[in-house]
């Protein structure tokens, strides 16, 4: 048999896998034990760590629920085999946050054919046959970043400046949508110039750093960097700092985790970030609704929020960080 790598560490994970007395939740037949399999794309990025943490915390409230999380190690092939294995185990609900859309669509369809309810989280697949999709609206977030950019560069109709956009993974819906929303707004401003051809930073800080290092060498005047997530924006900031040019450039990111994006905004390294909530806890709640025979929404959109100098400190305080 093939070896599988599952993560179930820490107290919360342990509690999540305990099967004790019937839960007081609405989770259908409380004498029945449910097994949810969650295929997570990676566990190295901080946003993913928070995602799993929230999910395990929610699952731990339900003693009759066992949550198994697999780590796709940021590779499509690994994630496909993780999902195959959940199908073989006949989990009650499959949750998946895919590396990319195209490569994971086939195996998601396979799970649906096997009559397993599928909840897709954050990054989408190329089918809408799943039971539910839960995530932020990345077009809306992109537009918010676009509006913020226009404001920073002089306001509607008068905005002027050179912009570098650093993409997340180009084969993912969040990157496409974050571009789309942003472009919808800034392309209306004739004074705003986009300097680079789309460049794939695969959501990674190091790639943001490298792409920005090249951009700094090619362009004498860069006014604003729009990173598709906070790590990319921060990588770009570090590159500008190493080139002694960070003070002339504004940096915008997305995610808004207190200990990363919000902290960078509070320190004045990023100008703003836009919250992209982790969908794990909601995924558990919807999965239990499915088990209870309740109807769930086909699309559940999580809200965003703009974080800049005006509210960063307050958010850190509320998170117990500053
Ligand atoms: C983490 C991450 C987040 C980003 C999301 C998009 O893996 O890169 O930073 O917002 O995925 O799917």
What positions do the PLM features span?
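A residue-level marker of the well-folded mature domains of exported/periplasmic proteins
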Residues: 7-11, 18, 28-322
């Amino acid at each position: 048999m093939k070896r599988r790598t599952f993560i179930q560490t820490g107290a919360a994970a342990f509690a999540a896998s305990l099967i004790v007395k019937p839960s007081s939740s609405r989770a259908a037949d409380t004498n029945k034990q449910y097994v949810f399999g969650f295929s997570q794309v990676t566990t190295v990025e901080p946003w993913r760590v928070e995602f799993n943490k929230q999910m395990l915390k929610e699952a731990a409230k339900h003693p009759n629920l066992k949550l198994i999380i697999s780590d796709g190690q940021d590779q499509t092939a690994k994630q496909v085999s993780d999902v195959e294995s959940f199908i073989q185990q006949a989990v009650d609900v499959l949750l998946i946050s895919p590396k990319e859309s195209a490569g994971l669509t086939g195996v998601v369809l396979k799970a649906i054919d096997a009559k397993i309810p599928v909840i897709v989280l954050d990054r989408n697949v190329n089918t809408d046959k799943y039971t539910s999709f839960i995530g932020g609206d990345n077009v809306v977030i992109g537009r918010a970043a676009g509006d913020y950019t226009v404001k920073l560069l002089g306001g509607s109709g008068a905005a002027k400046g050179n912009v570098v956009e650093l993409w997340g993974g180009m084969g993912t819906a969040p990157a496409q949508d974050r571009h789309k929303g942003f472009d919808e707004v800034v392309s209306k401003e004739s004074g705003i110039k986009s300097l680079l051809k789309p460049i794939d930073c695969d959501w990674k800080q190091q790639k943001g750093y490298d792409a920005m290092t090249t951009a700094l060498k090619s362009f004498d005047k860069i006014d604003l960097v729009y990173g598709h997530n906070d790590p990319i924006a921060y990588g770009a900031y570090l590159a500008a700092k190493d080139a002694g040019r960070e003070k002339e450039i504004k940096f915008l990111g997305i995610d808004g985790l207190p200990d990363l994006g919000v902290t960078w905004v509070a320190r004045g390294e990023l100008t703003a970030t836009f919250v992209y909530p982790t969908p794990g806890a909601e995924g558990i709640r919807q999965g239990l609704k499915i088990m209870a025979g309740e109807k769930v929404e086909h699309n559940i959109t999580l809200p965003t929020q703009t974080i800049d100098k005006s509210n960063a400190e307050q958010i850190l305080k509320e998170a117990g960080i500053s």
